[in-house]
């Protein structure tokens, strides 16, 4: 069983002005096998959250087979609600138009994540941020550190 914890962080959540970071950690049977973080500029918190999940998955994808189960953990209501409330299905049916009749934000990132939603190999869980979950706190620190350190990629 693999688990990916992911988190994003920004200071100034405006599209062209936000400075952010994303972080992830990958566990196999409870043991940390990979972690990473990236500094981002001109971003929003939602973009950072999505990029954390995407990068965590990309790191894991070469290690797993189609038989492996993968659980994703995020404190992002944006990601979790998209999955649990089926927003993504409506977006696909409506040509990437949301319930407010506007183009879906972050479409290019969602297009990378949505295929995972429809695969029984992957499960998605919401954790409460800053509530003592060890691995959520860990990736929060990675994301915040990346936000503060320009040119950080590891």
Give the role of each language-model region.
Residues 46-50, 133:
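Glycine-rich phosphate-binding loop at the start of an alpha helix
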Residues 1-47, 58-61, 141-154:
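RNase H-like nuclease fold core
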Residues 9-14, 57-138, 147:
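RNase H catalytic domain
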Residues 53:
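Short, conserved alpha-helix that lines the donor NDP-sugar binding/gating region
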